[in-house]
């Protein structure tokens, strides 16, 4: 914007402009047509000019590290990518994953931490799966068993110890169902699981028991992909692992916009100086990797420009996360805003280094060519 106020100190002029959002540095001799005088930008060695050009992006990323440290150090512990347990009706448990698996790659996307895992799974493609497959049958069977358990989970007259017995029966039975090799076996194990739950209820009349009906006709969407894990010290690739997929509401179902969710828990990482610094580094690097990957996918057509946000979208996002945080407390609101600011800061640093003429990345490329060939690129063709 236009200059409101300016003051010159030495060879530098400081200005306050009409829109004091961010800032910029204009150096003598960097623009086309300016004279190359002593002390101007183009009069210094090319190595020094390269350092000046990349300094802004480097500072953005370093600031991202500092803010990420402030965000990370508050946590009591951190999440790994090693599966510790599955929910009783976990779909991933019957499509390949096992307790103790350390997930290191999803559909070719390397997994460094839990944030990578969330990004990789949430961006998986989804396909329509027929309802008559063994995997879907086992999922519906475990869900039916959970339905039986839920009747007792709502019973306030049961003590925690009593309810735990019901849950143990459910968990043990679902684990067997997930390992079933056929629908018939899964059905038998479903009966066994339901009866073991009802057997804990002394007032239940077992003669009235009926096998829960399983819908095998309805097709459904499934997020799926190849997952590389470390199991018993060896890397193995599990093909077409299907993740728990659902519609958030009726509108999402009408528009065929399913959502993916985790149906397993991961082992915690103990908090100490080393893990705090390690999480800070890997989380920031993961954020940078996410930005670059998203740009590549944009070129490949996996994302559209409609999925990207400009200033208005960013402002809206900040407002939304702040409002969500305020529902649980002021500190959560501040942390939510801090996380968005980390994302924006790292984004700016990375995008600014893209090799386009209008960005620092384009200038860096020209200076790099000048350094290699010992000759500047002509400013005019």
Residue ranges of model-derived segments:
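Terminal peptide-recognition signature
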Residues: 16, 56, 92, 100-103, ...
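Small-residue-rich helix-interface/hinge motifs
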Residues: 1-36, 351-373
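Internal alpha-helical transmembrane segments
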Residues: 12-15, 19-88
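Functional transmembrane alpha-helices
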Residues: 40, 44, 149-156, 165-171, ...
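Conserved PDZ fold ligand-binding element
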Residues: 93-115, 127-202, 207, 284
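Pore domain of cation channels
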Residues: 49-62, 332, 339-353
């Amino acid at each position: 914007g236009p200059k409101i106020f300016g003051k010159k100190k030495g060879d530098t002029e400081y200005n306050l402009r009409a829109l004091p959002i961010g800032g910029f540095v204009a150096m003598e001799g960097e623009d086309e047509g300016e004279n190359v005088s002593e002390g101007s930008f183009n009069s210094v060695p090319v190595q020094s000019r390269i350092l000046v050009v990349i300094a802004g992006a480097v500072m953005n990323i370093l600031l991202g590290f500092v803010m990420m440290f402030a965000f990370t150090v508050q946590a009591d512990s951190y999440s790994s990518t090693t599966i510790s347990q599955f929910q009783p009706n976990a779909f991933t448990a019957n499509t390949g994953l096992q307790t103790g698996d350390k997930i290191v790659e999803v559909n070719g996307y390397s997994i460094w931490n839990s944030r990578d895992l969330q990004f990789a799974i949430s961006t998986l493609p989804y396909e329509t799966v027929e309802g008559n497959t063994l995997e879907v049958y086992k999922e519906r069977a475990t869900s039916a068993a959970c339905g039986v358990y839920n009747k007792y989970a709502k019973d306030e007259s049961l003590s925690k110890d009593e309810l735990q017995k019901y849950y143990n029966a459910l968990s043990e039975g679902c684990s067997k169902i997930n390992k079933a090799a056929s629908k018939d076996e899964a059905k038998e194990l479903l009966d066994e699981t339901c009866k073991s739950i009802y057997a804990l209820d002394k007032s239940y009349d077992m003669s009235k028991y009926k096998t829960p009906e399983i819908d095998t006709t309805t097709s459904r969407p499934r997020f799926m992909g190849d997952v590389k894990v470390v199991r018993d010290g060896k890397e193995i690739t599990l093909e077409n692992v299907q993740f728990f997929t659902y519609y958030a509401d009726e509108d999402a179902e009408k528009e065929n916009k399913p959502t993916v969710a985790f149906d397993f828990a991961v082992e915690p990482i103990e908090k100490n100086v080393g893990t705090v610094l390690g999480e800070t580094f890997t989380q920031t690097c993961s954020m940078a990797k996410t930005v670059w990957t998203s740009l590549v996918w944009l070129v490949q057509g996996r994302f559209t420009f409609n999925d990207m946000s400009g200033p208005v979208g960013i402002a809206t996002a900040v407002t939304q996360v702040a409002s969500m945080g305020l529902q649980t407390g002021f500190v959560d609101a501040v942390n939510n805003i801090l996380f968005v600011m980390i994302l924006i800061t790292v984004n700016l640093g990375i995008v600014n280094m893209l090799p386009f003429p209008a960005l620092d990345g384009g200038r860096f490329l020209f200076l790099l060519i000048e350094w290699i060939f010992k000759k500047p690129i002509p400013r005019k063709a």
